[in-house]
Amino acid sequence: MQARGTVKVQGDAKVDGKMSTGQHSHHQHLNSTQANATTTALEYRAMNRPLYRGPISHNIISEMAEGFYVLSGGYKKLFIPSKDVYALMQNVGMHLTEEEFHDALRVIGQSEPQNADELSFSDFLLLMTREVDDTMADELRSAFFHYDKYKTGYVTRKQFTELFATLGERSTPEELEELLAVAEVDETDDKIDYNRFVNELTSRVNCM
């Protein structure tokens, strides 16, 4: 299983006693040591910045589907345990803490406690292959985490405006209204889903 800037199941990586043979066409010009070092660096960067810039090809989707199948124990299941995804990352050299892994789940919108134990294929694909505008999304989410002490995935309207009133160059009232429009909130909304906001903002930036 291989994706650009994401987790790859290599020849001897095992999940629940099963083995998956990865495709190595992107690294044929590298020797084994260089390939492993490059892959590990990309994997680490991918989880610290879980989104990458680039199209998702049919081959990548197929490889992700293969990995999802392996994690399902060889059965066609709709969901796989998120703990197995975490174990896979540990097996391929991504030594993430559980907190870092759960932060990655929050990035893809899995902020509700009842949704955190399982991932659908679309969630799995999203976790591994999303786009990003360099460091902006991570830095912005980190700023929201300061207000979201209990990791709910939401901030209040007041916290949202306070953040952008003090972040970098202060936003004007007009700019704040535009940001609230991106967040798709009106005057009656007090809670803002900041993951959804960052995703929408990043999508618009990437389309520029």
Curated annotation (Swiss-Prot):
Domain EF-hand intervals: 64-98, 99-134, 135-170, 171-206
UniProt-annotated binding residues for Ca(2+) 2: 148, 152, 154
Superkingdom of the source species: Eukaryota
GO molecular function, one term: calcium ion binding
Key word Ligase present: no
Keyword Metal-binding attributed: yes
Residues in coiled coil: none
Gene3D superfamilies found in the cross-reference section: EF-hand
A single cellular component GO annotation: myosin II complex
Classification via InterPro entries: CALM/Myosin/TropC-like (IPR050230), EF-hand-dom_pair (IPR011992), EF_hand_dom (IPR002048)
UniProt-recorded name of the protein: EF-hand protein 5 variant 1
Source organism of this protein record: Trypanosoma cruzi
